[in-house]
Amino acid sequence: MTRLATLITLAGLLAVSPGAYAQRNRNDTGGSTGAEGLNSLAVKAGLLYFGTASDTRNFADEPYMSVVNNTNEFGMIVPENSMKWEATEKEPGRFSFANADRVRALTKANGQMLRCHALTWHSQLPNFVKTTAWTRDTLTAAIESHISNEVGHFAGDCYAWDVVNEAVNENGSFRDSPFHRTLGTDFLAISFRAAAAADPNAKLYYNDFNIETPGPKANAAMGIVRLLKEQGVRIDGVGFQGHLTVGSTPSRAQLASQLQRFADLGVEVTYTELDIRHKSLPVSSRAAQDQARDYVSVIGSCLDVTACVGVMVWQPTDKYSWIPETFPGTGDACLFDANMNPKPAYTSVSSLLAAAAATAPASVVPPASVTTSKTPIQAGAGRETVSIAGLTLALSSLAFGMFML
């Protein structure tokens, strides 16, 4: 931790009101997992956050929200759907951010970081994007308008944006979409440049699934990073979605090696949508332990790579997981069961992070509202480079044992 970062952290502590301390303590005791949750352990182990997806459809579920609101468990929230194009601009130029604003308000009230998802994606598009007879000029203008309005609306509040999501097929070719059909690969630079202009401080990510191991798709994703850098376009990170299967998850060493391949391109990396589903249900005790092992492999790989800044799970609970609907007959992919009880996978991840925290160098951890600089983390660089993004939410990712009230 640099001296500057330490001073920033102390400034944040001095700025915190007694009410904010009380809010932190209420959050820290929420849920059913005890005082030392995954986020606090992850931060002590050297990550910036351990977070989860959620959205407004879940907000009325009090037992669920007691866990999601617990900053000791989750230091970052990403909305599942309420920031996607279909949700925010159903008709050209008519924007609605009501649900996304509710997610942002939740993170501000809790002192959590906000991850923002997703801007240019072939799926969940409004009809006008799918059906208009676009030209290069008109589609470029539509992309720039959508991104400038949405990213501008949330400017200063998003740690990162998934600027382009799932642009390539398994064989490494580009997905068919209005964007690629009309603009070729130029849609990548158009999207990233628009996002950078609308919020210079947000991290800009390419996000995809099935890039956790080497192959044509991962190579194509690396090609996107190289292409943007060659064009002088800022890209700060690559998101590994991590939708994996119990028993087929690569080893910790294999996963870390793949993370490092991307980090060597000069970007930070993170797991953005982690869940590990069982192939069949109900789940045996042996299968539950296998799932726990696989979760440890994934999260351990992030700990092993300096440029891996954190982990996001795609919902904390099986109750709201997308898996059963999308992959019938499979499921139970999350860390909590449908009744919000921690599963063996949770216990194993907690033990992993606790062990890593116990051996991590002692340092003062920056609060959630002090984000890493926009300069990409290079392979071998430390996790300590920080810049101030406002100190008003200064509590959520502190080392929670430092100050006891």
Swiss-Prot record:
Subcellular location: Cell membrane; Secreted
Catalytic residues identified in the record: E166 (proton donor), E273 (nucleophile)
Membrane topology value: Lipid-anchor; GPI-anchor
Disulfide links within the chain: C302-C308
Gene3D superfamilies documented for this protein: Glycosidases (3.20.20.80)
Signal peptide: 1-22
Molecular function terms from GO: endo-1,4-beta-xylanase activity
A biological process term (GO) from this entry: xylan catabolic process
Pathway entry: Glycan degradation; xylan degradation
Catalytic activity annotation: Endohydrolysis of (1->4)-beta-D-xylosidic linkages in xylans
Glycosylation sites: N27, N69, N171
Residues covalently joined to lipid (GPI-anchor amidated glycine): G380
Enzyme Commission number(s): 3.2.1.8
Residues of the GH10 domain: 32-352
Primary location class: membrane
One Gene Ontology term, aspect cellular component: side of membrane
Alphabetically ordered keywords of this record: Carbohydrate metabolism, Cell membrane, Disulfide bond, Glycoprotein, Glycosidase, GPI-anchor, Hydrolase, Lipoprotein, Membrane, Polysaccharide degradation, Secreted, Signal, Xylan degradation
Enzyme superclass (EC): hydrolase
Propeptide: 381-405
Function text: Endo-1,4-beta-xylanase involved in the hydrolysis of xylan, a major structural heterogeneous polysaccharide found in plant biomass representing the second most abundant polysaccharide in the biosphere, after cellulose.
PANTHER family, per database record: ENDO-1,4-BETA-XYLANASE, GLYCOSYL HYDROLASE
Family: Belongs to the glycosyl hydrolase 10 (cellulase F) family.
Protein name per its UniProtKB record: Endo-1,4-beta-xylanase 5
Organism from which the protein derives: Pyricularia oryzae (strain 70-15 / ATCC MYA-4617 / FGSC 8958)
